[in-house]
UniProtKB/Swiss-Prot annotation:
<dbReference type="InterPro" id="IPR015424">
    <property type="entry name" value="PyrdxlP-dep_Trfase"/>
</dbReference>
<dbReference type="GO" id="GO:0009058">
    <property type="term" value="P:biosynthetic process"/>
</dbReference>
<comment type="similarity">
    <text>Belongs to the class-I pyridoxal-phosphate-dependent aminotransferase family. Alanine aminotransferase subfamily.</text>
</comment>
<dbReference type="GO" id="GO:0005829">
    <property type="term" value="C:cytosol"/>
</dbReference>
<dbReference type="InterPro" id="IPR004839">
    <property type="entry name" value="Aminotransferase_I/II_large"/>
</dbReference>
<dbReference type="GO" id="GO:0030170">
    <property type="term" value="F:pyridoxal phosphate binding"/>
</dbReference>
<keyword id="KW-0963">Cytoplasm</keyword>
<comment type="pathway">
    <text>Amino-acid degradation; L-alanine degradation via transaminase pathway; pyruvate from L-alanine: step 1/1.</text>
</comment>
<dbReference type="Pfam" id="PF00155">
    <property type="entry name" value="Aminotran_1_2"/>
</dbReference>
<comment type="subunit">
    <text>Homodimer.</text>
</comment>
<dbReference type="GO" id="GO:0070062">
    <property type="term" value="C:extracellular exosome"/>
</dbReference>
<dbReference type="InterPro" id="IPR015421">
    <property type="entry name" value="PyrdxlP-dep_Trfase_major"/>
</dbReference>
<keyword id="KW-0808">Transferase</keyword>
<dbReference type="GO" id="GO:0004021">
    <property type="term" value="F:L-alanine:2-oxoglutarate aminotransferase activity"/>
</dbReference>
<comment type="function">
    <text>Catalyzes the reversible transamination between alanine and 2-oxoglutarate to form pyruvate and glutamate. Participates in cellular nitrogen metabolism and also in liver gluconeogenesis starting with precursors transported from skeletal muscles.</text>
</comment>
<protein>
    <recommendedName>
        <fullName>Alanine aminotransferase 1</fullName>
        <ecNumber>2.6.1.2</ecNumber>
    </recommendedName>
</protein>
<keyword id="KW-0597">Phosphoprotein</keyword>
């Protein structure tokens, strides 16, 4: 016995002891999680940036990160009023400075009065600062033409993502054939597939129609639901509008049809509406699911369960790092709503600076305020430039042989389809890569352009895409698009 103990001690001294936590012994659901937006291509982009800093010669001088919707990382300037008020909230000593307009000072004082200890450094209640929840409710009422919004149904969150995960946690239950199924659009934002994998739910894919500008077809919802009921219990339907990664904006008629479908099939609706300010195409208009639902009247308005999400990260603000967001729940069971608050309480509260920023987004300067003119000019300039970039992206890609791109009606991305030669597909398979992953890796290595392969979002079999943000400055975007088109032509020739 003593000898055995001595052997173990010697093994420990020599570093031979096995790890308690190993890949084989860790949570298998975590191993199944994939998040393409920050996946292997992005890791390689980071390595290339490091190599460039070290003086390693490359066929390019910089890595262009067109993989993620992070506006300020791509050079967009913050909106002055938002940052002025935040600066005053973070450092109240500045309230006596003549360098800040009076309306910014009043807004900062109002927010600080609602904070514990009159400081952004204090925790808030778990559902968010009450004053800000009330301002969010008033914003929703204005947006939806006066339809009432109850601040008690508004929960602030760490970006929209945190709220989406929380609602999905409430929905997931059962084992085997009774496991919860969630219908998600394909292509989809990988937060959904990653969260469902982590929670052990069943991902139920419904395909958007690329031939009709990524339209949502209720017949396709019926197909997906019918097939899913053989192996799980579908309980929820997610819609992303405007679309990520596909950039489409749903019509009111489509939203009404989706609501009727969800009601008839007893599905909880999740409306991811974080790009509601990002609508560019003539004839396109954002319609909130809440507004359409309420205007449909009974039985839908009083019974269909809905959670709708918004964020400070997108829109004209692009304030990703502050992690501000909210969810409004409609027709949710009161007892379940208390359970949602309990879940949020475990994480204490959303970041208070993010809550403050959200307040400024939902209640911007009024026309009579000193900051209004500058605020409005900056906001419109951002949205006008995004609209120009959306049009340019569509135009350049559709002029390139072997690339086709649907109109970027909204959001911040294009999702072009690329033709890949059979020999390129075979080479990718030899390397154990998805064909579009192979294409995107080669693109990165030869041009420094970082985009995300369509396989990370889901796509119909035999088709290949990539997602690219439209956020780089206009002239840089023009060069990027031309460079990408030339690379595709060269790649096609190489493997023909």
């Amino acid at each position: 016995m003593a000898s055995s103990t001595g052997d173990r001690s010697q093994a420990v001294r020599h570093g031979l002891r096995a790890k308690v936590l190993t890949l084989d012994g860790m949570n298998p659901r975590v191993r199944r999680v994939e998040y393409a937006v920050r996946g292997p291509i992005v890791q390689r982009a980071l390595e290339l940036e490091q190599e460039l800093r070290q003086g390693v010669k490359k066929p390019f001088t910089e890595v262009i990160r067109a993989n993620i919707g992070d506006a300020q990382a791509m050079g967009q300037r913050p909106i002055t009023f938002l940052r002025q008020v935040l600066a005053l909230c973070v450092n109240p000593d500045l309230l006596s400075s003549p360098n800040f307009p009076d309306d910014a000072k009043k807004r900062a004082e109002r927010i600080l009065q609602a904070c514990g200890g009159h400081s952004l450094g204090a925790y808030s209640v778990s559902s968010g600062i009450q004053l800000i929840r009330e301002d969010v409710a008033r914003y929703i009422e204005r947006r939806d033409g006066g339809i009432p919004a109850d601040p008690n149904n508004v929960f602030l969150s760490t970006g929209a993502s945190d709220a989406i995960v929380t609602v999905l946690k409430l929905l997931v239950a059962g084992e085997g054939h009774t496991r919860t199924g969630v219908l998600i659009p394909i292509p989809q934002y990988p937060l959904y597939s990653a969260t469902l994998a982590e929670l052990g739910a069943v991902q139920v894919d419904y395909y958007l129609d690329e031939e009709r500008a990524w339209a949502l077809d209720v017949a396709e919802l019926h197909r997906a639901l019918g097939q899913a009921r053989d192996h799980c219990r579908p309980r929820a339907l997610c819609v992303i509008n405007p679309g990520n990664p596909t950039g489409q904006v749903q019509t009111r008629e489509c939203i009404e049809a989706v609501i009727r479908f969800a009601f008839e099939e007893r599905l909880f609706l999740l409306a991811d509406e974080v790009y509601q300010d990002n609508v560019y195409a003539a004839g396109s208009q954002f319609h909130s699911f809440k507004k359409v639902l309420m205007e449909m009247g009974p039985p839908y308005a009083g019974q269909q369960e809905l959670a709708s999400f918004h964020s400070t990260s997108k829109g004209y603000m692009g304030e990703c790092g502050f992690r501000g967001g909210y969810v409004e729940v409609v027709n949710m069971d009161a007892a379940v709503q208390q359970q949602m608050l309990k879940l949020m309480s475990v994480r204490l509260c959303p970041p208070v600076p993010g809550q403050a920023l959200l307040d400024l987004v939902v209640s911007p300067p009024a026309p009579t305020d000193p900051s209004f003119a500058q605020f409005q000019a900056e906001k419109q300039a951002v949205l006008a430039e995004l609209a120009a970039k959306a049009k340019l992206t569509e135009q350049v890609f559709n002029e390139a042989p072997g690339i086709s791109c649907n109109p970027v009606q909204g959001a911040m991305y294009s999702f072009p389809r690329v033709q890949l030669p059979p020999r390129a597909v075979e080479r990718a398979q030899e390397l154990g890569l998805a064909p579009d992953m192979f294409f995107c890796l080669r693109l990165l290595e030869e041009t420094g352009i970082c985009v995300v392969p369509g396989s990370g979002f889901g796509q119909r079999e035999g088709t290949y895409h990539f997602r690219m943000t439209i956020l780089p400055p206009l002239e840089k975007l023009r060069l990027l698009l031309e460079k990408l088109s030339r690379f595709h032509a060269k790649f096609t020739l190489e493997y023909s």
